[in-house]
Amino acid sequence: MTTNDLFSIYAFSNMYDIFPRKYSQKELEEYHRKNPLFFSYTIFPVIKHRWSKAYICFQNNVYMLNIELDTSKPYDRVPIQHLIDIRPISTDIKKEIYKISDKTFITFECYSYLKCKGYNSIYDITLDDKRGLLSAGNILSIFSSNKQMPEKSSIGILKNPKPFTVIKFKSLSLITQLQIFELLRKRKQIVVTGSTGIGKTSQLPKVIMWYNYLFGGWDNLDRVRFDYISRPIVLSLPRVALVKSNGINFLQSLGFSDFEGSPVELRYGGKTEHTTRQHDGIVLSTNKLTSYSLSNYNIIIVDEIHEHDRIADIIISVLRKNIDTIHSLVLMSATLEDDRDRLQEFLPDVEFYHIEGPVLYSIKEIYVKNKYSYDSKAYTEEEKKNISTTLNWCRPRNGMCGILFLASVSQCISYKKYLEKSNSDMDFIIIHGKIPDITEVLNAVQRPGRERPCILVSTPYLESSITIRTATHVYDTGRVYVPKPFGGDQLFISKSMMTQRKGRVGRVSKGIYVYFYDMCLLKPIKSIDHEFLYEYIVYAKKFKLSLPNDLLVIPSDKDMLKKSEEYIKSFNISFDRLFEIYVNYFVNMVEYVKIYNKGGKKAENLDMFERNDILTGETLKDIKNLQLLVKINTTTRRKKMYCYKGEILFGPYMNTVIRLSSKQLYRNYVYMLTERSFTLYR
């Protein structure tokens, strides 16, 4: 019998094929005969959730714990030393008491408490000791089995007023749960992969939260210790919308309607959806907010690692150097085609676990070939025609929707305008990360009773961890706009990104994935080579990382890394202060730290500009004073627009050639306001 089998009685109740269970003393004896360690690990959740304020008292000739009585009343304490050598004379299973002398008894739970207080090893726990552990575990509702029980049996397990939702996903199967339990018990770094739609993001964190609820706080489950450190787990996500949507899903599936008093907390953009949190719950947080509170968590889950979100990569790099400060690191992605070898090399004790199983429903693939090569000027127009024609014979039913993946916001606007002309019987809705009421827009798309089909014309924003219940079709152009300092490139996506896009369907019904590109063009994207490197440097200094070798992804241009570090040092602001600024503000331009460092109204107004695009006259003046100059070398007029070619005159990217456009005529120089906007030089 494996250790996994010993933990099968603690599996999280998915209410599909795993249900809450209260075991009898007779069943305990049967399990004990199979393996003396069965139910011994119950000691840990009982210490944490039942015995934390327990003491022995004596009532009506029975030694018992105060928690077995009316807890609102005080009782005289009995010192443990007075009872340390007692042994049962006889056992009354029905009353759950041992007789220890002619007229004196002790409850099973009190006896377990008394004996376990003196143990150092899980192997010391006997059958007599486990009887009280079983009683306490039944009260806590921490056991489960495959014996079907009514949904209401899950009420109250986590103080939830309503039942757990019935979940069929493979991520909550017993096999998956036991494997994850084993890896967590061994304190491995765990990399979880599996098809999109099997519940990695929506369900697996509940298994990890449940493990932490039961056993979190102990590094070694073979040792019995009554002292522990209780900390929550965190599910770290790249975008606010993912935090919100997954948070609501967790809340409702765990039987809650309100965050207050639940085990679920949301943290994003300076907001916290919670006031009173359960200590062993789950925090859903944006990567940025996770990054500066790593020590607050027992287990850290980083999702969508294939995206190589800058802060996510930094979190992994920091934790690799400080792995002993947490219990476990869990990384999740639909696929690791581009990253497995590096993670194997980078993490000290990593284990890869793939959750087998297809998505819930089949996905049909259709290739619509573009007759022009991608480098042809005619490619884009042909692509638009192909999409428009395809929507005539391959479209969602009324009330359902499709997702059209495009590279950028400007492309979304252009394609929507084109497609509406020839598809007037469909609704086209643009989706991207800057839409302020994105959750409401997506909810409206999914509301019952919609009379027309709709197409969500989306940037890669919808690529990950958002389930659109009415989505039946994906139309993929296979491209993504990758920003780079003072510009950007449109690239073909990686295989990982393609897998994510395809996985937007097949979750709630059969799906169709239509792709308008040659899959031979897919290749990995090394995000760090397209990014400013300042944030990597600030975090590296804070957490004593050695650059570049301690980074998960090492930049190709190491000279730029050195130049960027020297540039930051020239600000004469301590790295501790820089870190504080970076974790509290967006800092889209590194030079903004000079304004944020002043604090007060100046910092407040700049933050308002970065978050809400509200620019005051004072903030405009402050940004101009940073002298972020661009020299205009050439000017070309196209219709009503002026197109400029210029070069950067500041920082490590000095002399970088950039292209700007505006309806206004500028001469000689302009000030950069943001990486993407500029104003008159005066």
UniProtKB/Swiss-Prot annotation:
It is found in: Virion. Pfam families: DEAD, Helicase_C, NPH-II. GO terms for cellular component: virion component. InterPro entries: DEAD/DEAH_box_helicase_dom, Helicase_ATP-bd, Helicase_C-like, NPH-II, P-loop_NTPase. PROSITE patterns: HELICASE_ATP_BIND_1, HELICASE_CTER. It catalyses: ATP + H2O = ADP + phosphate + H(+). SMART domains: DEXDc, HELICc. GO terms for molecular function: ATP binding; ATP hydrolysis activity; RNA binding; RNA helicase activity. Keywords: ATP-binding, Helicase, Hydrolase, Nucleotide-binding, Transcription, Virion. The keyword Lipid biosynthesis does not apply. This is RNA helicase NPH-II. Belongs to the DEAD box helicase family. DEAH subfamily. ATP binds at G194, S195, T196, G197, I198, G199, K200, T201. Residues 386-551 form the Helicase C-terminal domain. Its main location: virion. A motif (DEXH box) lies at residues 303-306. It comes from Fowlpox virus (strain NVSL) (FPV). NTP-dependent helicase that catalyzes unidirectional unwinding of 3'tailed duplex RNAs and plays an important role during transcription of early mRNAs, presumably by preventing R-loop formation behind the elongating RNA polymerase. Might also play a role in the export of newly synthesized mRNA chains out of the core into the cytoplasm. Required for replication and propagation of viral particles. Its EC number is 3.6.4.13. Monomer. Residues 181-354 form the Helicase ATP-binding domain. PANTHER family: ATP-DEPENDENT RNA HELICASE, ATP-DEPENDENT RNA HELICASE DHX37-RELATED.
